[in-house]
């Protein structure tokens, strides 16, 4: 009789079976790995991976079980209560704050890319946000050649659709954007119609961890500053890879914490305390490092993996956001917007502190899905 499969979280399976070591310490299990047979990946409601245990491997099963994260109630859609609460907070935060952002900063809801040490005006900041898009495309070697340029693009965590509309014009491409915020999706679509792009750009409310698209649909998968909101980084990356067509480029621009040294198992307590304060106001789950992202990509056999720290190139951004909040227009808009936006404004100095102390890194990670 065939052994019954036992289900464990995918992150545990990858950590133990491939011995990458991120998030778990599993060196003591390496000598016993031959007793574990990894079955083909079969996603379930809770995104667990099946392991078929061979004879005399109960002890391994119990040790794997002990390595799991605390369990939570799983709802009918496969989400834990904790994830549902987080995503509800994210949606409400952006429902509340997107209007004030657009009014002051325009339709690109992300950092700008600046030459180090420069002094810039608000108009320069908007130019810098476009430059951020172009620099990320250049870093990933996305071609402008009419025969090679992307034709189908997904914007994961699209905000009010600034990147999507930019791509539609730049590449004459079909773009789809997803966001947790109904207010953002509605505004993004309205702007697309106003710009005559309704035939090529569309937006919807959807979960980046369970994207509403078939496998292999897009030849450019774009995530600009949305990864930091993802409670399961491995599942997030798996979804980016799943919807990518063979040969597609994947671009992740995101906030990370610094890489840990070989002797470290976690951030220092004062560093973690700083990040926790930011998480509370911006509805962020636990942070990861750029190295963590790279390990996930390597485990999925992605090609041409590249990474860079662009922290010095975004340094003028947060001081500029604070200055805009202290203008009369910014202050009155902030008060009208609501408590979640006010809380976010109050921790902006902590973002500056995190960058200055090298705890926070502004990271770009790119790769290509094999043909």
Curated annotation (Swiss-Prot):
The gene is TMT3. Residues 243-252 are annotated as: SAM motif III. Residues 1-65 form a transit peptide. S-adenosyl-L-methionine-dependent N-methyltransferase involved in the biosynthesis of biologically active monoterpenoid indole alkaloids (MIAs) natural products including vindoline. Inactive with picrinine as substrate. One of its GO terms (cellular component) is chloroplast inner membrane. Residues 153-162 are annotated as: SAM motif I. This is Gamma-tocopherol methyltransferase, chloroplastic. Residues 216-224 are annotated as: SAM motif II.
């Amino acid at each position: 009789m065939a052994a019954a499969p036992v289900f464990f979280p995918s992150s545990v399976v990858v950590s133990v079976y491939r011995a990458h070591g991120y998030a778990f310490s599993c060196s003591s299990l390496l000598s016993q790995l031959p007793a574990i047979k990894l079955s083909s990946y079969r996603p379930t409601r809770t995104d667990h991976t099946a392991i078929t245990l061979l004879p005399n491997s109960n002890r391994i099963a119990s040790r794997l079980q002990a390595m799991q994260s605390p369990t939570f109630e799983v709802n009918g859609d496969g989400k834990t209560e904790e994830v549902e609460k987080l995503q509800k907070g994210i949606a409400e935060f952006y429902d509340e704050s997107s209007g004030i952002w657009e009014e002051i900063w325009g339709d690109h809801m992300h950092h700008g890319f600046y030459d180090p040490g420069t002094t810039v005006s608000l108009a320069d900041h908007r130019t810098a946000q476009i430059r951020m898009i172009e620099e990320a495309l250049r870093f990933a070697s996305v071609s402008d050649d009419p025969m090679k340029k992307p034709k189908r693009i997904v914007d994961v965590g699209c905000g009010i659709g600034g990147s999507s509309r930019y791509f539609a014009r730049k590449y004459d491409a079909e773009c789809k954007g997803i966001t947790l915020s109904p207010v953002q999706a509605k505004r993004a679509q309205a702007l697309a119609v106003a710009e005559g792009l309704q035939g090529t750009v569309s937006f919807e409310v959807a979960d980046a961890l369970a994207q509403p698209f078939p496998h292999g649909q897009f030849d450019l998968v774009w995530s600009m500053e949305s990864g930091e909101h993802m409670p399961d980084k491995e599942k997030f990356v798996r979804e980016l890879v799943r919807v990518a067509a063979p040969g597609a480029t994947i671009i992740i621009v995101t906030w990370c914490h610094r890489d840990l040294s070989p002797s470290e198992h976690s951030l220092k307590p004062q560093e973690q305390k700083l990040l926790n304060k930011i998480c509370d106001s911006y509805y962020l789950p636990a942070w990861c490092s750029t190295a963590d992202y790279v390990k996930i990509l390597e485990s999925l056999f992605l090609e041409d993996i590249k990474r860079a720290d662009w922290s010095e190139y975004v340094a003028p951004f947060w001081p500029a956001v604070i200055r805009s909040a202290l203008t009369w227009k910014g202050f009155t808009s902030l008060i009208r917007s609501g408590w979640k936006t006010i809380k976010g404004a109050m921790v902006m100095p902590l973002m500056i502190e995190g960058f200055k102390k090298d705890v926070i890194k502004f990271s770009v990670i790119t790769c290509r899905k094999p043909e």
